[in-house]
Design a protein with these regions (language model features):
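Class I SAM-dependent methyltransferase SAM-binding "motif I" and its flanking Rossmann-like core
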Residues: 137-180
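Ligand-binding beta-strand-loop-alpha-helix segment within the catalytic cores
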Residues: 57-133
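Short gly/pro-enriched beta-turn/loop segments at secondary-structure junctions
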Residues: 128-134, 139-141, 185
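Single conserved hydrophobic/aromatic residue that forms the stacking wall/gate
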Residues: 183, 188-193
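Glycine-rich beta-strand-to-loop/alpha-helix junction loops that act as flexible
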Residues: 36-41, 137-141
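A glycine- and small-aliphatic-rich helix-loop capping segment at beta-alpha/alpha-beta transitions
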Residues: 48-58, 82, 86, 150-159
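Short, well-ordered amphipathic alpha-helices
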Residues: 20-21, 44-53, 85-88, 116-120
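N-terminal glycine-/serine-/threonine-rich phosphate-binding loop
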Residues: 1-34, 109
Length: 194
C-alpha cells in the first residue's frame, strides 16, 4: 500500500473525506460499508465532514460500523459512537437505519457475538467473512489498533469477527474488530498523525 503524507492533520482529514466520497460517487448503484475508529484523528475528520462536505456525500448509501468500542454507554466521553454521533451523525442526513453501533454498555462477550452476527448480516460476505469497503484504523501511542494492544497476539489469528478485550494499561473493557477481518477487508486505511 502506498503511503500518503500530508503537511497537517486537517489536510489529512480532508483528503481522506474526499477519497471516501469519491469512492461512493464513482459507484452510484451500491451501498458502502465503512468501519470507523475512534480517537483524535477521526474526531477531526468527523467535524470537517459535517461542516464542509455534507452536501456532496451520498449519506443514504453509507452504512456506518465501528472498528472498536470501549465498554461504556454512548453518553460517556470515552464512547467512539458517542463522539461520532455528536460530531457527525447528529448533524448530517444519514438514515438512522444505516448506523450500526457497538453497544458498549452491554456484556462485552455477548455484545461482541451480537455485533459479529449483525456485521455478517449487513456487510457483503466473501469466503464466509464479511468484507468492509473500507476499514479506517488509527494507531495509539502504545502501538494498539482496533483495541488490540501489544501482547495480545491471540487476536491476530482468531476466526471471530469481533472479540471482547481489555486495555492492559488501565483494565478498561473493549470490543475489537479482529485482525483476521482487518486483513481481508479491502482497502484498509491506517491513519497515523504525528
Amino acid at each position: 500500500m502506498k503511503p500518503y503524507i500530508f503537511p497537517s492533520s486537517i489536510e489529512t482529514a480532508r483528503a481522506l473525506i474526499l477519497h471516501l466520497v469519491k469512492l461512493m460517487l464513482d459507484e452510484p448503484d451500491r451501498t458502502f460499508c465503512i468501519a470507523f475508529s475512534g480517537g483524535s484523528t477521526p474526531a477531526l475528520m468527523f467535524d470537517l465532514w459535517a461542516n464542509e462536505y455534507t452536501d456532496i456525500t451520498p449519506w443514504e448509501r453509507l452504512k456506518v460500523f465501528w472498528v472498536d468500542e470501549r465498554c461504556v454507554p454512548p453518553e460517556n466521553s470515552d464512547s467512539n459512537y458517542g463522539m461520532m454521533r455528536s460530531l457527525l451523525l447528529s448533524i448530517v442526513p444519514i438514515p438512522y437505519e444505516n448506523v450500526f453501533r457497538i453497544q458498549g454498555e452491554k456484556n462485552p462477550k455477548k455484545e461482541a457475538a451480537r455485533y459479529s452476527k449483525l456485521v455478517m448480516k449487513e456487510v457483503p460476505v466473501e469466503n464466509e467473512f464479511p468484507v468492509f469497503d473500507v476499514v479506517l484504523l488509527g494507531a495509539g501511542n502504545d502501538g494498539h489498533t482496533s483495541s488490540i494492544f501489544p501482547g495480545q497476539e491471540e487476536l491476530l489469528s482468531t476466526d471471530h469477527i469481533y472479540e471482547a478485550n481489555f486495555n492492559p494499561n488501565n483494565g478498561q473493557k473493549r470490543i475489537a474488530l479482529t485482525l483476521s477481518l482487518i486483513h481481508i477487508s479491502e482497502p484498509t486505511r491506517p491513519i497515523s498523525i504525528s
